[in-house]
Amino acid sequence: MENPITMTISSQPPKIKYLTNKDLLREIHLSKNTYCSFISPDYSEYDLILPNISKINVRTIAEAKRNQAIRLSKRAHESAVLTGGKKLPAKEFEVDYKTIKKVDVVFRIMTFEHIPLAPGRKKTLKNTADSHDKVNFPPFQHWKFDDNNNLIPVGKSHWKGDLTTGEFNKEHGKMTNNLARMFLKLCERYATRGNVRGYTYNDEMRGQAILQLTQIGLQFDESKSDNPFAYYTAAVTNSFVRIINIEKRNQNIRDDILEMNGMNPSWTRQNSGVSNFSAGTGASSGEGGGDWD
């Protein structure tokens, strides 16, 4: 008797992801760390963002413990899935936040205390940032409890060297290569949208968007939102619209000069005149009717 023929159905190919907020947040975090100084690399990760030290209390400590437990659980689950090559229930890797010690929690405090003052930088001071030296992203400090239950600083942004003997520095860091690639991919993908891909100056719009992202890419504030994709998409949209408006204004000036010299303007100007006439009278389009007052 012949052996039966067995057929194996291959699983569906993995879904190709475009950009996720999780990946963007990770690269933003790594990029900002290059501008920071920490007592230990372990303190570069934070569990909770607060506006000032006075907000650290029993409630915020418990919230920070929960956040750290969630992060450790996800990290253990992802590592097990990569190692085993198969899906595993996430509940098996859950970490109880009550097992996390108080001294293991790190707080990110948004503050300008370590940023030098810059009197005269702006005439009218609207916020705290206007009275300090300009930096490329909101400054912060990392704090934690020591064994004596005292809060101590363990990290500073825009800082080089030791936390006590070091100095302010905002030029020694850089953006990660992965974040730069994400910006390029975001602009490339946006440039293929139906409402912008037909423009002859599509490359100029992409270039302006990339330039804008390199300038404001790290200004995303994690304490206000966890959706950097929307933040960057809005910046890219504004850059594209800006170039479109500039090109339209230049085209209008060129058409005005051509008409002043008795020459035919661009087809866009001519077609806009026909459409305006049609909208005003309804005669050219064949729709509607009525007399032209």
Model-based region annotation:
Residues 159-163, 207-212:
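A short glycine/small-residue-enriched secondary-structure motif
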Residues 3, 204-205, 225-229, 249-258:
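Short, glycine/acidic-rich hinge or "gate" loops at secondary-structure transitions
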Residues 214-222, 241, 246, 262-273:
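Short, charged low-complexity intrinsically disordered segments located at boundaries
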Residues 252-293:
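Intrinsically disordered, low-complexity, charge-dense segments enriched in Lys/Arg
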Residues 1-201, 281-293:
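Extreme N-terminal regulatory/targeting segments of RNA polymerase sigma factors
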Residues 193-201, 213-235, 246-248:
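Short alpha-helix-to-loop micro-motif enriched in aromatics/charged/Gly
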